[in-house]
Amino acid sequence: MSQIIEYSEKVMEHFSNPRNVGEIENPSGVGTVGNAKCGDIMRIYLDIDENQVIRDCKFKTFGCGAAVATSSMATEMIKGKTVEDALKLTNEAVQEALGGLPAVKVHCSLLAEEAVHAALWDYAEKNNLQIEGLKPPVQH
């Protein structure tokens, strides 16, 4: 017997009408993460200006509705922010912004956080930058 998962209105809105879908040509940073547990793959693209402000961000996600919704919300939350502020993005903040996630889908918000941090890591590596608090991407 399958279990019915209930999503918040905000999750359904971001799944049905995701923001920032696509790729950025010549991105400043790209982060790709995946989770073998449920098969979700997220890729976040960043366009960062000379003042370390995220001018634009896009995502491509292969996965469930919660994975798409968390990717969409995460990109909305970091667009226009500094690299330093984007680094503070947490999976809890993504969940809260979406009005919560079912317990079995919390890992999707963690993937969104990890994808953003992986893209920031890629940006730092490409530009030979040391960014306080930035850690190498998590490998699943």
Residue ranges, per PLM feature:
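C-terminal binding/interaction regions
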Residues: 1-26, 30-31, 49, 81-85, ...
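Flexible, solvent-exposed loop/hinge segments and secondary-structure transition points
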Residues: 26-29, 35, 54, 60
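Active-site cofactor/cluster-binding pocket
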Residues: 36-40, 100
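Short, thiol/selenol-centered motifs that function as redox-active sites or metal-ligating centers
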Residues: 38, 61-69, 108
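Short beta-strand elements
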Residues: 40-50
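Immediate flanking context of iron-sulfur cluster ligation sites
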Residues: 52-62, 96-99
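Alpha-helical support elements that line or immediately flank enzyme active sites
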Residues: 66-81
